[in-house]
Amino acid sequence: MAGRELSHLQQLEAESIQIIREVAAEFDNPVMLYSIGKDSSVMLHLARKAFYPGKIPFPLLHVDTGWKFKEMIAFRDAQAKKFGFELLTHINPEGLAQGINPFDHGSAKHTDIMKTQGLKQALNQYGFDAAFGGARRDEEKSRAKERVYSFRDRHHRWDPKNQRPELWRTYNGAVNKGESIRVFPLSNWTELDIWQYIYQENIELVPLYFAAKRQVVERGGQLIMADDERMKLAEGEQFKEELVRFRTLGCYPLTAAMHSEADSLEKIIEEMLLTRSSERQGRLIDSDQSASMEQKKRQGYF
């Protein structure tokens, strides 16, 4: 009897599950980085499938900044309660004490201290030797050249010239003490693949991904939503109600919404089939050339 041919999404799913299982078997202390976005939700779903009916054998880590959307934090806690996974949270105590924020200190400094340094603190504190991330190669050019097993030195830095060959899905996870690997099971997925898989598997998401009327202010050609009373308005700025959704999620002052009527998964997929703009155009941290994604990753970013 001829073997059953896997669909495109089934092939991606099988590849990702194999990577997750291999890391769990190969490394002593792995962790899954959980940013609460759509890619993290897919990665969590794959991890649950990989070890079903057992529990996920490693913790999930959320590096908080204090500036995430309230709906993201509520969703994170609800998912942990629903699925019973071990959830670790960390926020940079020095940055918190200094009052680091995106309004007064700018996106580059805020991202470095609260995200990059915060992540490195958490990895050092728990001694993780492998960290799963939800990055995909189609997102951004520096991620396009990163391996599935991304080697990091003792300071969590990435050197794009010091990468290991990955032939026939064979991964080299050998590390010395203090070194680690960032692992990207979704490397070969596209944004459209993610949305189609979410639809197929009925994966829950933060409601911010769906179009709704929200209070936003136009700033630098971008629509920024006020999520709490800390939102600062410049002279002449005022809030207006717009029908918008978020294509990507992060710290709310640094994440722009987009005009959209896509209030369902079907409509979002249709929108993705027609769009020609970058997924990360709404991430204000990517607009600073001096703090490009590759430079951030060299310093230890996700």
UniProtKB/Swiss-Prot annotation:
Highest taxon listed in the record's lineage: Bacteria
UniProt KW keywords: ATP-binding, Nucleotide-binding, Nucleotidyltransferase, Transferase
GO BP terms in the entry: hydrogen sulfide biosynthetic process; sulfate assimilation
Enzyme class: transferase
Catalytic activity: sulfate + ATP + H(+) = adenosine 5'-phosphosulfate + diphosphate
Pfam families the UniProt entry points to: PAPS_reduct
Nucleotide-binding as UniProt keyword: yes
InterPro entries in the record: PAPS_reduct_dom, Rossmann-like_a/b/a_fold, SO4_adenylTrfase_ssu, Sulfate_adenylyltrnsfr_sub2
GO molecular function (one): sulfate adenylyltransferase (ATP) activity
UniProt-annotated stretches for the region Disordered: 280-302
PANTHER family per record: SULFATE ADENYLYLTRANSFERASE SUBUNIT 2
Family recorded in the similarity comment: Belongs to the PAPS reductase family. CysD subfamily.
Role this protein plays: With CysN forms the ATP sulfurylase (ATPS) that catalyzes the adenylation of sulfate producing adenosine 5'-phosphosulfate (APS) and diphosphate, the first enzymatic step in sulfur assimilation pathway. APS synthesis involves the formation of a high-energy phosphoric-sulfuric acid anhydride bond driven by GTP hydrolysis by CysN coupled to ATP hydrolysis by CysD.
Quaternary structure note: Heterodimer composed of CysD, the smaller subunit, and CysN.
Protein name: Sulfate adenylyltransferase subunit 2
Native source organism of the sequence: Shewanella baltica (strain OS223)
Top-level taxonomy: Bacteria, Pseudomonadati, Pseudomonadota, Gammaproteobacteria, Alteromonadales
